Amino acid sequence: VSSIVSYLGACDASAAVRLGGTAWFVAACDEDYILRVYDRSAPGPPAASVELVDFLKPEDPEHEPDIEGAALVGERIYWVTSHGRDGDGDEQESRQRLFATSVSATARGVRIAPVGRPYTRLLKDLVRAPALEPFELRRAAQRSPQEPGGLNLEGLAPAPGGSLLLGFRNPIPEGRALVVALGNADDLVEDRASTARLRVAGRLDLGGRGIRAIEYVPESKIYLIVAGAFDDARDFRLYAWPGGLHDAAVGLDVDLDDCKPEELIVTEVRGRRVHVELLSDDGGRKAGGKKCKKADPEMRSFRGLRTVVEI
């Protein structure tokens, strides 16, 4: 049985993590520099928010950060931006950040604080990494993110052994979604390393789609993936992936209603039944007679689709 709830204050939650054992989740919107804390048990406005513009230090705060992925590792959340160009195809340094925040949760609330300093050279590392040379990321980085073969990084997940997995919405080389393992995120944000350690972790057949979100389910030792088109086409599907380089991803049947999922959080695991909440990109929906992104902040909202998948 599925249900839909609404959260206020933003038109999307392009990156989010649930804080284990609690009803809280922390979400970023791709358009601003604010992390918002929501309570799943009482959907509505954020219970708290944290402003990050002074920490991320964009050259122009009017430029969007395009935060797209989040991964919880212990009491730290890693966040990654798209590392792509803007919608006009212009390079924007505000979209080139890997950063971390500390997080602690109690029944009363959530505390979030920046950790270390943002790493700004991940795009250079991706372009130069010998293991990634076949995917021509240098050429991809020169294209608009929603062009065929552009560059758009949207998924981030923890991996057993301490790595993070980066999931690419674009490019989709030879029709397969690209997953790259980042081996030293902690050293990068704590300024103990100057270059990312990168290797190919997966080339997934997602029906020609890229990765919009990826989430690790430790109880099941499996990843759940929201797959979608590299452009605005409404073509979404959920997959389960065991996580090995040669493992195949398996499609899951979920009725997405009219949601446009770009993030998911796992809320409960009961055997093979995994309870998830899919967070919808509702920037194009109407709010107060205007497109959500153009509406007054208090009118903005995004939806969560709560459902169960069998893996």
Located regions from the model:
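Sequence/structural signature of beta-propeller domains
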Residues: 1-311
